[in-house]
Amino acid sequence: MPCQHDCEIVISHLMKLKLISCEIFYREFNAVIARSPHLVDAEFLPKGLHDIGTARMRDRIQAAIDGIKDFSYDAILIGYGLCNNGVVGLTSRDRPLIIPRAHDCITLFLGSKERYLDYFQNNPGVYFETTGWIERGTASGELSQLTVGSKLKMQQSFEDLVRRYGEDNARHLWEQIGNPEKQYRKITFIEMGIEPNDSFETAAREKAETRNWKFEKLAGSIGLFQRLVNGGWNDAEFLLVPPGCRVAATYDNGIIGIEKA
């Protein structure tokens, strides 16, 4: 059912905004929040949410939204892309949500969905690295027990699979889902301009060398991050979700839309 887009945010000299974001963006958002004209409180959720399945990921983000008790916020900023439909269904009872029109986090790192599509189509088999993935890319604690890989018992060696399933079945499982790196041929390190030194690039380069993959350094863009925390959200880049509506996938160039909650 369509959701009437009758919500309007009055952009004042100073707004109070709440950001809920994946921790992969920790350095980028902290850098742009320092330059925002508004008061922005940030809450970062574990990267491992991407690995526990769409429904659980959405539930954890929704719980963070529902847990906001400060009613003085003008809007809630969502630091996620569509991310395997992990934001589909998100809603807020009393404040609008602002979400980037992004396929996934690569869109934010590259600065636009158009640049993302162009690079994706011309560079198959790419494994991306940024500061966030390098220093925060491994699930731990509770989330490590909920990851899809753990649930399927694929975080083990080929020999373990042979003992459990027999050689023929183990070989099939390993080829299908037990060896996720088989689809990659290159590591692309996205340089965002917020790196303290070249240690992250070096780590990405060494990872490529150990796998005999190609390596590329690509200039990212901080622009989408900055525009999200600056306000004045244009419809081409951001979706405004009024209270009582929820996020829906549109499967078109807009990526996400709204429907009645």
Feature map (PLM): residue ranges:
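A short beta-strand-loop structural module common to alpha/beta enzyme folds
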Residues: 39-55, 217-221
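Extended, basic/helix-rich recognition subdomains
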Residues: 167-261
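N-terminal basic/disordered segments at the start of proteins
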Residues: 3, 7, 13-36
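Glycine-rich, highly charged phosphate/nucleotide-binding loops
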Residues: 55-67
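Long, charge-dense
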Residues: 95-143
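N-terminal glycine-rich phosphate/adenylate-binding segment common to multiple enzyme folds
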Residues: 64-116
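A conserved mid-domain beta-alpha-beta active-site/ligand-binding segment of alpha/beta enzyme cores
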Residues: 122-198
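Gly/Ser/Thr-rich loops at beta-strand to alpha-helix junctions
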Residues: 20-27, 76-88, 103-105, 133-136, ...
